[in-house]
Swiss-Prot record:
Fe cation 2 binds at N58, E59, H74, H78, H107, D112. Myohemerythrin is an oxygen-binding protein found in the retractor muscles of certain worms. The oxygen-binding site contains two iron atoms. Muscle. Gene3D superfamilies: Hemerythrin-like (1.20.120.50). Monomer. Keywords: Iron, Metal-binding, Muscle protein, Oxygen transport, Transport. This is Myohemerythrin-1. The lineage of its organism: Eukaryota, Metazoa, Spiralia, Lophotrochozoa, Annelida. It comes from the Eukaryota. GO terms for molecular function: iron ion binding; oxygen carrier activity. CDD domains: Hemerythrin. InterPro entries: Haemerythrin, Haemerythrin_Fe_BS, Hemerythrin, Hemerythrin-like, Hemerythrin-like_sf, Hemerythrin_metal-bd. It comes from Phascolopsis gouldii (Peanut worm).
Length: 119
């Protein structure tokens, strides 16, 4: 597995080379960071769910348009993560924050990196 950056911010090692997706990934990092900074904030959790939903929709639309071969399992990973987020309520616990941090890092560097140059 890939290391979790500390502080938890996007850096160049996460670049997928599609500016819109890189910008959205930065927003996901910020969303998780904000939830970690104030685990009692329902607003931060809602914001994270909203930006994640929007990003997944945009990324999946690009994969569909490009007829990307791994779109089905990729969409399932998105669906599973959103289901997990949707089941959460503030206050969050450290285990949940750690899960979200790790999921995002591993997903981008393992799964998203497979579509580099293919969308």
């Amino acid at each position: 597995p890939f290391d979790i950056p500390e502080p938890y911010v996007w850096d160049e090692s996460f670049r997928v080379f599609y500016d819109n997706l890189d910008d959205e990934h930065k927003g996901l990092f910020k969303g998780v960071f904000n939830c970690a900074a104030d685990m009692s904030s329902a607003g931060n959790l809602k914001h994270l769910i909203d930006v994640t939903t929007t990003h997944f929709r945009n990324e999946e639309a690009m994969m569909d348009a490009a007829k990307y071969e791994n779109v089905v399992p990729h969409k399932q990973m998105h669906k599973d993560f959103l289901a997990k987020l949707g089941g959460l309520k503030a206050p969050l616990d450290q285990g949940t924050i750690d899960y979200a941090k790790d999921w995002l890092v591993q997903h981008i560097k393992t799964t998203d990196f497979k579509y580099k140059g293919k969308l």
